Amino acid sequence: MKLYSPAGRALWLTTFALAGLGACKSVKGTFSATPTATISKRLPPLEITADPGPLAMNDGALPEDPLRLFKAELQRNVLEPTDTATFGYARLVVTKVKTVRTGRSLQAAQVITFLIPSIFGAPLEWYKTDLQAEVQMMNANGELLGTYTGKGTSSVKVAMYSGYSQTEAPRLADVIALREALAQIRPQLDTASTRLRPLMMTGGQVNNPTLPGSSKQ
């Protein structure tokens, strides 16, 4: 088959496009990045737990992602540095999650055109996640002091150059949505901190570091 024949050109363009699909935006640092937005009155050190709920059944987030993100958010923006004593529990619970893939019809169109649009950054599809989570604050005895709810959404494009790879996009969509939900909860904790702090301090120190039914890192 000659390269300059129609079939040869089609094969060459398709091979080039498929090889280039790996040239997507880097996710390096994206999963570990935590914004700095410290609340006005930090809470005392707490045991940090997480229940991924329906997120555990999603194809995107890794099992350790909810706890890791929650822990990073609290340690950077909400809690005082931990030494040895803790004065209660902070528990993240993911209550709702829905991820949809849109634009997949574009893939069929691009196959017909030998993926040439992909070479120029045309999207293949989007991963969109809607998520709801709540944070429960408890004293050392496990008594609930307050529940704070947030919602997050995301839309992650799968594309060369201007988007992310098909491998990373589902996880990134879940992580962005969860991070947005935590960002909504942060100002609620800021407002409640003047009430929560004395209740946690007077409740004493934690003797059992892990709440039943929770995960702890």
Predicted regions and their residues:
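Polar alpha-helical coiled-coil and adjacent low-complexity
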Residues: 89-92, 182
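C-terminal/domain-edge helix-coil "capping" segments
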Residues: 29, 124-132, 144-217
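A structural "domain/chain start" motif
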Residues: 22-86, 94-101, 151, 194-217
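A short, hydrophobic secondary-structure junction motif
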Residues: 3, 79-80, 130-138, 180
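Surface-exposed short loop/turn segments
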Residues: 93-145, 167
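Sterically constrained small-residue positions within well-ordered secondary structures
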Residues: 15, 39, 83, 124-126, ...
